[in-house]
């Protein structure tokens, strides 16, 4: 019996840390975006209640960010089964980087959506022509989270390709 530490005992920790970070950070972004743009909708709705349903778009877009984190967390957690097949440190680090890529991109997108949504719905109440511009900016902010989701899927697919030497 060798006393050399291979690191495989700690690899699932990094994998589950990646799953948790994907969900936690993306939900933090979703919560911030929902809260910030929701405050804008509520304050705008006092003066122009007929625009509330039209101005709910940033709140919905922010809520979608949590789903991206959930997708990556499920992909990662289904790939962690050290009893069925060997799970190396490479796999754990791949899953950790996957979760961080998706989670932090979701956090950044949520902050952008919240700030743009808050200012956008208030400005839309005063000048309705700004609605299309607000939607375009929100789409670009949402694309940040999509980039993180795509990179997260690519990185998590790299797990399981390592082999013991």
UniProtKB/Swiss-Prot annotation:
Lumenal side: 1-10, 77-95, 156-165
Topological relation to the membrane, as annotated: Multi-pass membrane protein
Stored CDD domains: ATP-synt_Vo_c_ATP6C_rpt1, ATP-synt_Vo_c_ATP6C_rpt2
Pfam families the record matches: ATP-synt_C
Role played: Proton-conducting pore forming subunit of the membrane integral V0 complex of vacuolar ATPase. V-ATPase is responsible for acidifying a variety of intracellular compartments in eukaryotic cells.
SUPFAM superfamilies named in the record: F1F0 ATP synthase subunit C (SSF81333)
Source species: Oryza sativa subsp. japonica (Rice)
Subcellular location: Vacuole membrane
Transmembrane segment boundaries: 11-33, 56-76, 96-117, 130-155
Molecular function via GO: proton-transporting ATPase activity, rotational mechanism
Keywords, alphabetical: Hydrogen ion transport, Ion transport, Membrane, Transmembrane, Transmembrane helix, Transport, Vacuole
A cellular component annotation (GO) from this entry: vacuolar membrane
Domain of life where this protein originates: Eukaryota
Record site: Essential for proton translocation: 142
Name by which UniProt lists this protein: V-type proton ATPase 16 kDa proteolipid subunit
Assembly with partners or alone: V-ATPase is a heteromultimeric enzyme composed of a peripheral catalytic V1 complex (main components: subunits A, B, C, D, E, and F) attached to an integral membrane V0 proton pore complex (main component: the proteolipid protein; which is present as a hexamer that forms the proton-conducting pore).
UniProt record similarity statement: Belongs to the V-ATPase proteolipid subunit family.
NCBIfam families in the cross-refs: V_ATP_synt_C
